[in-house]
Amino acid sequence: MTSIKISSDVFNKYHTNGKLRLSTGYVQEALEKQGYPGHDGVVQILKGKEDIGEQMGHGFTYRIRICDGIFQYNTLVSADIDDQIKREAEHLVEGAIIAITNLSTFSQGAGIKTSFLITGYTLLSRYHQTLSAPEVKPRSHSGNPAEHHGYRPNIVVEDVWPEAESITSEFQENMSNPPAAKMPKRESGGEASHNRVPAPEPHRSRAPPPPARRGPSNTERGVIPIAMVTPYVNNFRIHGMVSRKEDIKNIPAKNMKIFNFEITDSNGDTIRCTAFNETAESFHSTITENLSYYLSGGSVRQANKKFNNTGHDYEITLRNDSVVEAGGELLAAPKLNLKRVSLAEIAGHCGEMIDVLVIVEKMDAEATEFTSKAGKTLTKREMELIDESQALVRLTLWGDEAIKANVDDYHGKVIAFKGVIPREFNGGYSLGTGSGTRIIPVPEISGVSELYDWYTTEKPHSELKLISQTSGGMSEAPRTIAGLQEMQFGKDSDKGDYASVKAMITRINPNSALYKGCASEGCQKKVIESDGEYRCEKCNKSMNKFKWLYMMQFELSDETGQVYVTAFGDSAAKVVGKTAQEVGDLKDENLNEYNATFERLQFVPKMWRLRCKMETYNEEVRQKMTVFSVEEVNQDKYIENLKELIEQMKGIEDEGSY
């Protein structure tokens, strides 16, 4: 495969601070202006395929689906540049980034989606993940500019530019070490101008700069701003205050020690630093929180946003040759940089470290201890958080933080939580704390007074809602069983995705709907029956009783297909309309009525909320569907949903050829 060579001219034309930045909103503006005259649009290719044809007299040889970070759009590439296409077709595939230098639009008739035709482009890069901003998920544009008329997003979507690595490094070096001012020229034919700066004497070293009162400048001794730290800046040196220092973590399973700390410079930018094993011990004893240091040397890598909430794209791994020197200067404590996410939006950041500004609505009076599945004794304390988004979310404190937390310091107060992690369980969302979490009571930042005003004036009249992946529930447009199967719904999420279907039970086996479970509170392990006793391997004890529990598998069918689903616990109880114990008693006392209970469930249309997830079993990937809830069909709402689907389908171009 041929490589992509980027010239200095191309780099200078399209880079933004050394990175490739997409032209967010390009699709909308091109539709409004019927092309994009005089402007190049930097977009990413999501799909690409050779396809020779003609539309409205316009010949094309290639089809691509472009994304500007906000909108996606199907686009044709003109046959007029077929020679370029043949040279670069291997690159015009998913992940490539191009600059569209010439674009024309044409319509195939009233009510038909406007077509894009690229007549000029420059190939910039390849092999990128699909780019998007955390707060915006790219979506297909309908082709109707009126829907988003005037929309000009102020959103940055960018990535590193590997093909321009050498040019980027030179650019970063020039940014951190600007060239010295040029000497004024001598006046022709005689004495130098009286404004001329005398030339330095040969072989004399430059005098060191005078000491700065508030620490060295960004260019002194090669120091660069933390914001400029990237893998392409060689021999970097930064200066800042250690704003956070964690304890050394021991990982016995890997025989490893890890030490993390964060350093913040005078601009308020922060970067995370990590050291391992002997290096971790060395730097942990050297570094003190709230003191300033110079740091040089180390490997720069992509930040893992699951454990890093500094806001920096990169983090530093310290090596044996890394140098950390005391700064000597007392720097002002950096301002709290809170990248706030509203509670109503935490579902979009599941598994990531985020910041929230909230009011504690309720809190456990005391911490509680419990034993984990691994046999460890853990301590936790839960609280309920609210904000102006009218969402209510539970947060869990762990360990010492749970024990020392004082209700009077939290309840009804504005609190900033920096570095909490949203987690999903059975469709509901909560927040968890970790070693990287900071708790700041009544922080001095913008938004505090507004949040408290909302709490005192509007909150008493607001309806608070728990955040749930299923909160859309049966109100969202239903899908079909065949549609869920064909699109492998749930494959894009480790936790699975939720969908509603209108379907009926067409097959169920009463004999396997229940099992005998452990009678201990909170345990659902299947027991082993022997000599009149019931042994639970999980609890490691035998009892003279058990409890009935649901584990139902049954076939759901609609007009498009069938699928086997599983229902447990409360979800299964909603399906049957009885508790597992009630049905179990029927099995013991009246087997005919027991069987009739399940027969009555069949061939009755219901609205089902299903959790779909892809799982691997015996090296085969399968789609597993689990019942979350079930309701009677609200015919009026169902008809309304179908009408909405019909409206959404109007004007959608058939994309099967892409």
From Swiss-Prot:
It is found in: Nucleus. The keyword Zinc-finger applies. Transmembrane segments: none annotated. Residues 134-155, 169-222 are annotated as: Disordered. The keyword Metal-binding applies. One of its GO terms (cellular component) is nucleoplasm. Signal peptide: none annotated. A zinc finger (C4-type) spans 518-539. InterPro entries: Euk_RPA1_DBD_C, NA-bd_OB-fold, NA-bd_OB_tRNA, Rep_factor-A_C, REPA_OB_2, Rfa1. Residues 236-326 bind DNA. GO terms for molecular function: damaged DNA binding; enzyme binding; single-stranded DNA binding; single-stranded telomeric DNA binding; zinc ion binding. Keywords: DNA replication, DNA-binding, Metal-binding, Nucleus, Zinc, Zinc-finger. One of its GO terms (biological process) is double-strand break repair via homologous recombination. Belongs to the replication factor A protein 1 family. PANTHER family: OS03G0429900 PROTEIN (PTHR47165:SF4). Component of the heterotrimeric canonical replication protein A complex (RPA). As part of the heterotrimeric replication protein A complex (RPA/RP-A), binds and stabilizes single-stranded DNA intermediates, that form during DNA replication or upon DNA stress. It prevents their reannealing and in parallel, recruits and activates different proteins and complexes involved in DNA metabolism. Thereby, it plays an essential role both in DNA replication and the cellular response to DNA damage. This is Probable replication factor A 73 kDa subunit. It comes from Caenorhabditis briggsae.
